A protein has these predicted regions:
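A structural boundary/capping signal
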Residues: 24-443
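Bacterial Sec-dependent N-terminal signal peptides
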Residues: 1-31
Length: 443
């Protein structure tokens, strides 16, 4: 390598010597300062405008950029949801699934047809009650046996009235006899027949575990009942002996009203075997003025309204046995057709519409119980209509004067009916009835 560098050096030296020897070239002179041209430092470069401080302050900061991105993403999500809504609108099922494929539901459909054949202003509550309960038991009950028990009881009541010397043409006499049948021990000495009073059944009195706890057939079999079965049997027996009596409602409760020949009205509380004053019923604290104005509480029901109540009970039995489906809605609509202000039917309609709305909302991925998520239904006009229907129905229930009464409050109110003052008032009424009936017998 060193040898090659020496050779290269010698070659360059020889070339330089030959150049100097054979060419007359002037040696370069020292340049003067004045000969240099001033060069523009920006020559060939783009001109850049430097912004002032005010412009810099107006530029978006990191938080503003984040907010803009967040809004843009949210808008994109909403647009996607709208597209999704348009694509899936035709796939939404707006009706609750039917339980009609269950074999035992046929008994309810048959029972509905039987109830629909009844005249609204004149029907047999005995027959209607059997139809309703028999549907729940899948038509395994025997109407002839049920009718036999009712007739035998009717005969017992008539014989007892005759033994006591009551005028069986008087409505007061017949209702007082019915009251004693439910609340006292009765005997017919000539035939050695004895009847014990019915008792209030505190076990599952709302029928939550077993809906048949609410039935008249259960009351007749066990001698125990509650505020649904006791008044129902009273009306059945009143029908049997030709007494005029009416069903009336108060919060979570039903009782009997009847009037005597002087147009005086009386309240029969069968859960404790007493006559009850209007003031005692009002003392529950859950009867608002709106409820009295709308007539949902403390008013005697007409035949048409009573049939509506039976339809509501019928729908409740189906819903407890199977669940809410379009058949329940069909029955509720019939009940509301007969009695638009029925608080029982309106409450059931509220339940149905709520369940229907939640079912539809979940189909499009919306949690109906999440307020934030619920806002997304605006992309589904038909679902918005369902929600509006729910709210309208809730408003109607409120306008009728409904106020929720807890099970504890209800039990406390029932207990208050047994207080000394209430018992004294009831005993005084019984004395007055006996006096009136004895005077009639003497005449």
């Amino acid at each position: 390598m060193k040898t090659e560098l020496i050779k290269l050096h010698l070659t360059l030296l020889c070339v330089l010597i030959s150049f100097l020897s054979f060419s007359q070239v002037k040696l370069p002179t020292k340049p003067k300062t004045s000969t240099f041209e001033v060069i523009n430092s920006n020559l060939g470069l783009p001109k850049v405008n430097i912004p002032n401080s005010n412009l810099l302050n107006n530029q978006p900061n990191g938080m503003n950029v984040y907010e803009q991105d967040r809004r843009r993403v949210a808008q994109q999500k909403n647009e996607l949801k709208k597209i999704y809504a348009e694509l899936n609108t035709d796939r939404i099922n707006y009706s609750l699934p039917s339980y009609g494929n269950i074999e035992s539901t046929k008994h309810y459909r048959k029972a509905f047809e039987q109830l629909a054949e009844m005249k609204t202003d004149s029907f047999s509550i005995k027959k209607a009650t059997f139809i309703i309960e028999n549907a729940y038991f899948e038509e395994k009950q025997n109407y002839a046996e049920f009718e036999k028990v009712v007739k035998q009881t009717g005969n017992f009541l008539r014989e007892k009235m005759e033994e006591l010397g009551y005028d069986q043409n008087r409505n007061l006499a017949k209702n007082f006899m019915l009251f004693q049948f439910f609340s006292d021990t009765l005997q017919i000495k000539s035939k050695n027949l004895k009847h014990l009073p019915f008792k209030y059944d505190f076990e599952d009195y709302l029928g939550i575990k077993d809906w048949s706890q609410m039935f008249v057939s259960k009351l007749l079999a066990t001698g125990k009942g509650q505020c649904n079965s006791l008044p129902r049997l009273y009306l059945i027996l009143a029908e049997e002996i030709g007494a005029e009596a009416f069903l009336s409602l108060s919060p979570n409760h039903s009782y009997i009203k009847f009037k005597d020949e002087e147009e005086n009205w009386y309240n029969v509380e069968l859960t404790n075997g007493m006559f009850t004053t209007e003031s005692m019923i009002l003392q529950s604290g859950f009867i608002k003025s709106e409820a009295l104005q709308s007539g949902i509480y403390m008013q005697q029901m007409t035949e048409k309204q009573l049939l509506s109540q039976l339809y509501s009970d019928f729908a409740q039995g189906y819903a407890r046995k199977f669940g809410y489906d379009p058949f329940v809605k069909k029955v509720i609509d019939k009940a509301l057709e007969l009695y638009p202000n029925s608080i029982t039917a309106n409450m059931m309609n509220s339940n149905y519409l709520t369940i229907q709305f939640e079912y539809v909302a979940k189909q499009v991925g919306i949690n109906p119980r999440d307020r934030k998520d619920l806002q997304n239904i605006r992309n589904f006009p038909n679902i918005v209509k369902l929600l509006n229907n729910v709210n309208s129905q809730y408003n109607k229930v409120d306008d009728l004067g409904f106020e929720f009464m807890s099970a504890e409050a209800y039990q406390n109110w029932l207990a208050s009916l047994k207080q000394t003052k209430q018992k004294q008032d009831s005993d005084e009424m019984k004395k007055q009835f006996n006096i009136k009936l004895k005077k009639t017998f003497k005449n």
